[in-house]
Each structure stands twice: as C-alpha cells, then as structure tokens.
Amino acid sequence: MRFALTLTAFVGSVAALSITSPKKDQDVDLSEKTTIEWSSVSSDPSSFDIYLVKMNSYPPVNKLVAENVKTSEGSYTIDGVSADNGSGYQINFVSRDPQNTGILAQSQQFKVESSGSSTTSDSTSSASATGSASTSSSSTGTVSSTASASATASASATASSTLSKSASGTASKTASATGSETSGASASSTSSPTTTPNGAGSLTVPAGSLLLGLVALAL
C-alpha cells in the first residue's frame, strides 16, 4: 500500500506541468518573438502567470511577462521583452489558484542574446565616442585660440616697446644734433662781427698815417 502511494505521487509529479522550451543553454533573443512551450495534465491549474527570472544576479530579475495564460494552450509567444544579455535566465509559471499557489513549473537555465540590448549598447558607445571627440576638438580649438591670442599680444607688446625705444633714441639724437649745430652757429655769428670790426679799424689807421708820411716825403 505504501509503495503504491509513493508510485502514484511519483507519476503525478512526472506528469505535472513542465516547460519544454526554452531549453538548457539555449540562446534566446527576447527582443523578438519568443515562444514558450509546455506540457500539462488535467490536474494542473487552468491558468498561470509567466515570469522571467534570474536569481544569480544583483539585483535579481523577476519580471512579469504574461498574465492568465491558459494551461490548455500548450504554448505562448512573448514579444519585445527587455533584458540584459547574459546567462542564468529561467521562465517560471506561477499559479494564482488559492488551492495551488506558487511556482508550478520552472524552465532550465538559458542565455539571453537580445539584439535590442546590443544595439542600445553600441549606440551608447558611439554617442560617448562622438561626445569625447567633440570635447577634444573643442579643447584643441580653445588652446589654439589662447596660444594665438598670447602670441599676438606678445608680438604687439614687443613692437610697441621697439617703436618706443626707436622714437626715444631718434628724438634724443635729433635734439643733441640740433642743439650742437645751433650753439656752434650762434657762437660763430656772435664772434665774427665782434672780431672783424676791431681788426679793420686797427689796420686802417696805420695805413693812413703811412700814406701821409710818404706824401710828405715826396713833397
């Protein structure tokens, strides 16, 4: 009798609701239509909810993907479920029946290879690379502009200093030359009139006396 009860329980557990797809280590693209398949017996609840789970991650994944799915259907297609790529995912069938609540069946672990996740990741990487390149270009332009402005300011300062020095030197030399020439000319002009009349006067008097003397002797 005890053996019969044990055998009956074993047969019942084997014949209970069982998920046949996805299979172990199967690659599943959840961004596209994915069909979940199962087998059932008449004693199973008439409906259940479908969850996508991943317990070996942090935080764990426990996402509701379908509600009140009829057990008698034998399959259900989900479409466009968002999930990160990776392994260790499972499908759980969860019952709401008050007489049989909890997990009814659990699939084997499979891998998620969603093209949507890959595309999003690639787009993000591309946007980051573009932003970095733009920042780098902007920084380079700023440095170039700063360097150019500094060089221009330096050149202007040098030119101003050179012109200032040249102007000062020219003015000094001009003033010195002009002053020297003016002083020389003034001195020459002043001394010549003073010296010439005196010389002429002294030469004229002796000459007159000499001529008168010669005339007197001749007579």
From Swiss-Prot:
Pfam families: Kre9_KNH (PF10342). A lipid is attached at residue 198 (GPI-like-anchor amidated asparagine). Residues 1-16 form the signal peptide. Residues 114-144 have a biased composition (Low complexity). It comes from the Eukaryota. It is found in: Cell membrane. The GPI-like anchor contains a phosphoceramide lipid group. The anchor position has not been determined. PANTHER family: SERINE/THREONINE-RICH PROTEIN ADG2-RELATED (PTHR35185), UPF0619 GPI-ANCHORED MEMBRANE PROTEIN C1322.10 (PTHR35185:SF1). This is UPF0619 GPI-anchored membrane protein AFUA_3G00880. It comes from Aspergillus fumigatus (strain ATCC MYA-4609 / CBS 101355 / FGSC A1100 / Af293) (Neosartorya fumigata). The lineage of its organism: Eukaryota, Fungi, Dikarya, Ascomycota, Pezizomycotina.
